[in-house]
Amino acid sequence: MAKLILVTGATGYIASLLIPRLLDSGRRVRTMARHPLRLKGRNWFHYVENIPADVMTPSTLAPALHGVDTAYYLIHSMASGQGYTEREIAGARAFASAAEVAGVKHIIYLGGLADPEGHISPHMLSRIETGAALRHGRVPVTEFRASVIIGSGSISFEMIRFMTELLPIVPGPAWINNNSQPIAVQNVIDYLMAALDNPNGSGQVFEIGGPEIAQYKDLMMRYARLRGLKRRVLVVSYIPLWFMSFGVGLMTPVPRPIAHALIGGLSHHSIVKHDKVLRVFPEVKLVSFDEAIQIALARLSPRHIERVWDDDEGHTKTLKHEGFFIDYRKIKVSAEPEKVFNVITKFADHFGTRQFTVDTVEPDHLLLLRSQLKTPGEGWIEWQVSRIVNSTYLTQTVFFAPRGTAGFLYWYLLSPFRAIIFYWLIKNIARNSMVE
């Protein structure tokens, strides 16, 4: 029987990419999250064992760690606000102790890249001290300290994406001239996977980055070039951290507490000083920054997006995610799925091919249409019909990927009308389904 792998922080970004790779490699996977039902929208949900547990409640850890060979520690507490450093260290120590008792053979931890001997932000210091807390136990720990991670859905990349798309002139403090060594998210996953099979990395700390060193402002300018946008960076002598985190929280998908911690972490260089990882894991072939951006942009489609919003917590949501503005609605319909889907196809026919073309169709379940309207961005509308415990549910999701400032203005200025139209649309589909 394949060894059991535990992935903590399963609702997070890295875990969402790591778990499919583990499953594809034939591993048995168990996920650990405080609220496992938030994972229901993930494609792999039914192929893994899901255990509710919280490192801040040590008594919950034993069931999650029982029978585990290797555990990935992908937990952070940035969203919890002040005092997160103490919580992260306490949680890591509790996990290390519980892993030792459970007989876990290996812990793999993903942290952040900074010089621990230099002047670094509380966020980066917390990442380093979390690794030290995990090593407090007797279970061997492999720690990867990553520079800026580039990939669709990465917090760092989404900050770059949304701010560069929105602002013709991007303001930034002096540290925007600091150096980083951005690494493609697929290479991060490559390293995390390689640590499972390559015993030479056990018990070591590795700094990981991509093949290029670039200033933070250059990352935005290169993104703009690949998107065909004309952008400038304006270096400002001083911008208060609270003001920057407020702006990032407003303009991007990154919540303000996380933005506050993350921006503080950008105030220093993030480059690899010790490249032993290249010798220990030569099987990992590094991807260039431009290629990483192009891969991320190629995923700008509803067919590739991670459905983090599809859970049991609310049936109407608007959010920013992976380059999209998203309007999500879900209602219960008193009709069979086939009848609901028949009404959906009639509505789609009414729109006509001049307005929309069919992107994806799964009979009686899913219809995804791509907009052909001339707008400053790309749009899709998707309907899904599902049968859950003798009840039929209809979900309607609108995706809009803005291109440049005009795309943002288009979405926000039409907000009042958009809300009315999308509400009317799903309600009419439901109403017509019941009289079909």
Language-model region placement:
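N-terminal Rossmann NAD(P)H-binding glycine-rich loop of SDR-like oxidoreductase domains
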Residues: 2-27
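Mid/C-terminal beta-alpha module of Rossmann-like enzyme folds, strongest
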Residues: 4, 195-261, 269-329
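NAD(P)H-binding glycine-rich loop region in Rossmannoid oxidoreductase-like domains
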Residues: 37-102, 112-119
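Substrate-positioning beta->alpha
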Residues: 91, 155-156, 175-196, 204
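Conserved beta-loop-beta element that borders a ligand/cofactor-binding pocket
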Residues: 111, 132-162, 166, 171
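A conserved amphipathic terminal alpha-helix motif
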Residues: 290, 294, 408-436
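Glycine-rich portal/gate segments that line the openings of hydrophobic small-molecule binding cavities
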Residues: 326, 332-380
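Beta-strand/loop substructures that line and gate deep hydrophobic ligand-binding cavities in soluble
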Residues: 373-419
